[in-house]
Amino acid sequence: KARVGFKAGVKDYRLTYYTPEYENKDTDILAAFRVTPQPGVPAEEAAAAVAAESSTGTWTTVWTDGLTSLDRYKGRCYHIEAVVGEENQYIAYVAYPLDLFEEGSVTNMFTSIVGNVFGFXXXRALRLEDLRIPPAYSKTFQGPPHGIQVERDKLNKYGRPLLGCTIKPKLGLSAKNYGRAVYECLRGGLDFTKDDENVNSQPFMRWRDRFLFCAEALYKAQAETGEIKGHYLNATAGTCEEMIKRAVFARELGVPIVMHDYLTGGFTANTTLAHYCRDNGLLLHIHRAMHAVIDRQKNHGMHFRVLAKALRMSGGDHIHSGTVVGKLEGEREMTLGFVDLLRDDYIEKDRSRGIFFTQDWVSMPGVLPVASGGIHVWHMPALTEIFGDDSVLQFGGGTLGHPWGNAPGAVANRVALEACVQARNEGRDLASEGNEIIREACSW
């Protein structure tokens, strides 16, 4: 009888993939998962299963395991802690060796870490809470096309948040009327106007017509106000080739910024566009359409801070990041946590703000967070205080809903912003005096 060189059959994941004695390396990618095991499954087994299925493991021992070094390539669950106040929920920390990932590919990183494991039978629910991206990996990415400082220099705007506005109604306007709305907003004092995320190239308004009329509006408003203006021209399309075609046309028109829906468009398309934008001097505005499908559930999916980190690596100069005060959900501390992850170079671990790992971006350019969704002029003091100068505040209905029209709505927002920034610089407290500051500004 031939002797078999390995022991076939199913064995517990924790025997191989749960290694509490492991000391993680500086080059490891670290992940924090919120694991809810099925009833009767021990936490160690569920956590080890997550590490296995998102790296080298499969459900049984295979003879080809002998042809490689599992110790070198396997993901390891190195720590488990129970979640306070939740029954049968754990945070599992997993370390992945750098060799498991293709350089410069967010697509590959996500395919590995969250690709397969979320449908796994042993886990009842699973959520990726945070990732630590080591410098050895982040240095393989270009990151944002330009970053915060270069954007301010391009626009010649300093010392205050930037103001934007999404053109509404988002669908149904003709290109000429759309351009007219853009012009009115920019003339009134906004820095940017924005295509809605679902404005691509529909029968009522084809992309080329929209680009032309918006460019005309832009230049007319610039000539009148003496300020540099921008309109986020949405280049998102059905294919990468078509997307780049639209970005090329935007560049030929000489406009400063284009836009992409990075989750529906996909990370491969987004990284492609980010590279084009850096090579051609375009700023890139990123919308997070579809994020709530992934990040809304508290115990399953992925936290937005992970999607935000991925975007900084893939590339974007602005990204929508919730408002803390408007119509869309977002807790203040958590939101500020990932806003810092977008803007700052070095962020300390701080569990109260949802930051599980210290993250060093080693001088990768920062991304401007965009506050957008149900905010209006009375929120301005709170927004100025919460987000600070390096942000874009976007008022859609809060501009266009003004009873006198778009331009007066834009004027109202600009006046409120300037008043809040001036009051803050004079040492007044925006939290307590905010409404008073806005009322004073009304009488200018």
From Swiss-Prot:
It is found in: Plastid, Chloroplast. The record marks 327 as: Transition state stabilizer. The modification N6-carboxylysine is found at residue 194. RuBisCO catalyzes two reactions: the carboxylation of D-ribulose 1,5-bisphosphate, the primary event in carbon dioxide fixation, as well as the oxidative fragmentation of the pentose substrate in the photorespiration process. Both reactions occur simultaneously and in competition at the same active site. PROSITE patterns: RUBISCO_LARGE (PS00157). GO terms for molecular function: magnesium ion binding; monooxygenase activity; ribulose-bisphosphate carboxylase activity. It comes from Watsonia angusta. Its EC number is 4.1.1.39. This is Ribulose bisphosphate carboxylase large chain. HAMAP family: RuBisCO_L_type1. InterPro entries: RuBisCO, RuBisCo_large_chain_AS, RuBisCO_lsu_C, RuBisCO_lsu_C_sf, RuBisCO_lsu_fd_N, RuBisCO_lsu_N_sf, RuBisCO_lsuI. The basic functional RuBisCO is composed of a large chain homodimer in a 'head-to-tail' conformation. In form I RuBisCO this homodimer is arranged in a barrel-like tetramer with the small subunits forming a tetrameric 'cap' on each end of the 'barrel'.
